[in-house]
Amino acid sequence: MLFVWSKLKHIWRMENRKMILITGAGPNGVTGHLIKDKLSTKYDILTPSSKELDLTNDEEVDFFFRGKSINYIIHCATFRSNHNISHFVDEELESNIRMYFNLAKHAHEVEKMIYFGSGAEYDKSKPIIEVSEENVGLHIPYNKYGLGKYVMNTDCRRSQNIYNLRLFGTINKYEHPNKNIISNICLKLANNIDVTLKRDCRFSFVDINDVITIMEYVMANDLNHHDYNIVSDDSYLISEIAEKLIVISGKQSRLLFEQSGCNLEYSASNNRIKAEMQNFKFTDINYSLYDVFNYIDMNKDMYDIKSVDSRWNVHSNGQYPLGGGKINLYYIAAA
C-alpha cells in the first residue's frame, strides 16, 4: 500500500510539473545547457535547437507556442555574426533584438520571462566602474551587442513579467578557452606554459551556479525591479585571478602581459540583488577557480592549445608563443 501511495505521489508530481522553454541550450549553448541539466529534475524542459526553431522568425515562434502550456521562458540564445547564417535575418543587432521581441510577444502567456543581459549595456567604450542599475542609459552603447542588450532592457523595464539578469564575467568550467578568460588561463596552466595575455583589466565575476540559484529565486518570488546586476561582492584584476590560479595549479608558469597598465574597468555593484536576497551568499572565488582548473586540467586533451584565439593572447607574426618567443612582454609576476 505504501508503495502504491508513493507511486501515485510521484505520478501527481510529474503531471503537475511546470514547463520551461530554454533557448540556447544546444551543444554550443553553455549557459542554457547547464540550466537544463540543473532544472530537469524539477521541471519539464523544452530546448528546441536553432534548426528546430528560428527565434528570429516571428511566424515560427508564434507557431511553436500554440497548444503549449509553458510557464517560464529562459532566454539564453545569443546570435553572433559567425553563427547560423541560415537565419531569417543574419545581422547581429537585428537578430538579437528579433529573438528577444519574438519571445517577449508571448510573455503574457507565461508566468515570467528571464533573459541574460550584459554589462555592455553600460557602454564598454568607456570605463564601467562599480556601476549600479540606475546608471543604465547614461551612455548609449557603442557596439551592436551592447546596443541590442540596451534595447531589450528598455523594454524589460516597461514589462509586467520580464526580468534581465545582467552578467559581466562568469566563472564556468564548461566555457571554452576561446570564449572565457578564466578557462583560457586554466588551459595554459594545465599545459605547463606561461600565461601570456595582452593587458590587465579589472572585472566583476560571478559563479555560474550562483546565477542559476538567483534565476530560480526570480522565478519563484515577487521582485521590486526588472533588471539586476549579477556579480559577486568583489571585483578582481585579471592578474589577481591568474595568480590565484597559478597557486591552485601548483605550476611554475609565469604571468606575462604585452602591455603595461590596465584596460578599461568592467565592474558593477550588486546592491540591488542583495537587497532582494538578503541571506544569499556568493560562492567564494577561490572555490570557483579551483573547480574550473580541475575540470580543464582533467580534460585538457579536448582542446588544441595552438588554436586558442587571440582575444586575450599575445601573438607574434600569427604564431602562438608557448611561453616565450621574441615578443616585447611586460613581466609582472612569477610563481
Which ranges hold each PLM region?
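N-terminal Rossmann NAD(P)H-binding glycine-rich loop of SDR-like oxidoreductase domains
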Residues: 20-38
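SDR active-site strand-loop-helix element
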Residues: 23, 48, 73-76, 113-119, ...
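Adenosine-cofactor binding site in Rossmann-like domains, unifying the SAM/SAH pocket
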Residues: 44-61
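Glycine-rich NAD(P)-binding loop of the Rossmann-fold in SDR/ketoreductase-type enzymes
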Residues: 56, 91-99, 139, 143, ...
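NAD(P)H-binding glycine-rich loop region in Rossmannoid oxidoreductase-like domains
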Residues: 59-95
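Conserved Rossmann-fold NAD(P)-dependent oxidoreductase catalytic core, especially the SDR/UDP-sugar
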Residues: 101-144
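NAD(P)-dependent short-chain dehydrogenase/reductase
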Residues: 142, 150, 154-203, 208-212, ...
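C-terminal substrate-binding subdomain of Rossmann-fold SDR/epimerase-dehydratase oxidoreductases
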Residues: 193-335
